[in-house]
Amino acid sequence: MQVADFDYHLPEERIAKYPPLERGSTRLLVLNRQSGALTHSLYAHLDTFLQAGDLLLLNNTRVVPARLFATRATGATIELMLLERHHHREQLVLYRGQLKAGEMLQSHGHTLLVEEVLPQGLARLALADGGDLHQFFTQFGSVPIPPYLKRNAEAVDRERYQTVFAAHSGSVAAPTASLNMTPELLQRLKNNGVEIAHITLHVGLGTFLPIRTESLEEHVMHRESYLLPAESVAALQRVKADGGRVVAVGTTVTRALEHSAPRILQSSAHAEIEGEADIFIYPGYRFQMVDLLLTNFHAPRSTVLMLTAACAGTDNLRAAYSEAVLQGYNFLSYGDSMLIC
């Protein structure tokens, strides 16, 4: 299967550059993957498409202020993106510009040392005074909004590029499928008998890396660490045993669920599950855990688009995206959403 099979024309005007004026006021395109039928609705009406006994799994990660600008000795400005805290990679950054190992950078009155320059635009940094680099970014950094927005982060992004239930800091990109969740919608879902559970998955480096192969089978997927609490494991086991439906909110949640499926389904224990999801989901994959998927409209040739196609069916998804463009839906992180059921 070729990456080019997942290309399509996305008009620039269909990319939402800012969040909607009111959280939860976006549109929702509902796709029935059995019939291919499409229903035009609103994100705020999600509760009308779910039923008692369903389980909604949300990613409660919190986006950190991971973007920072520094100055080289030459006077050139360089953009730095601090990646997720993860064992020995805790001082890894993604950079845009030129860097050399051993050079010093200046930022907000502090000196940063470039310890090592790595492939794919990565480097290992440290504060020259031995301070905590993550604390430094938290104090001086800005919200790492996606580069395709083609603007700097603004005050509105501090609140709106974050979910209302964000709890555990660590992501450099938001779990965008749930950006339009509101307390009111979550309460209606609970009142209707829909169970709400959480997973913590810190969205990291892979969000910014393009596919560099022509064939899907040759692509090596990035890893994302996750923690599924014991109460969420128990809820998933109970719902599956009772014949209920698991609704994954977002592609990262989907990857983590499918990665942990053997441990969830083959065990009666309710212990927490921790892992690193490196699973690459594309058409032909057989889902074990996820029954419904709530997700955004994704960029051409992206791994998240391929995952969505695996869930919806390639022809169904192609037709749905064509309809969405025609009907003026907004795409990508701050845009509208799809429910695949």
UniProtKB/Swiss-Prot annotation:
Top-level class of the enzyme under EC nomenclature: transferase
UniProt pathway: tRNA modification; tRNA-queuosine biosynthesis
Domain of life: Bacteria
Localization annotation: Cytoplasm
Gene Ontology molecular function terms on file: S-adenosylmethionine:tRNA ribosyltransferase-isomerase activity
Reactions catalysed according to its record: 7-aminomethyl-7-carbaguanosine(34) in tRNA + S-adenosyl-L-methionine = epoxyqueuosine(34) in tRNA + adenine + L-methionine + 2 H(+)
GO cellular component: cytoplasm
Alphabetized Gene3D superfamilies for the sequence: QueA-like
InterPro entries cross-referenced by the UniProt entry: QueA, QueA_dom1, QueA_dom2, QueA_sf
EC numbers, comma separated: 2.4.99.17
GO biological process: queuosine biosynthetic process; tRNA wobble guanine modification
PANTHER family with a match to the protein in the record: S-ADENOSYLMETHIONINE:TRNA RIBOSYLTRANSFERASE-ISOMERASE (PTHR30307:SF0)
Role this protein plays: Transfers and isomerizes the ribose moiety from AdoMet to the 7-aminomethyl group of 7-deazaguanine (preQ1-tRNA) to give epoxyqueuosine (oQ-tRNA).
UniProt similarity note: Belongs to the QueA family.
Oligomeric form and interacting partners: Monomer.
The protein, known as: S-adenosylmethionine:tRNA ribosyltransferase-isomerase
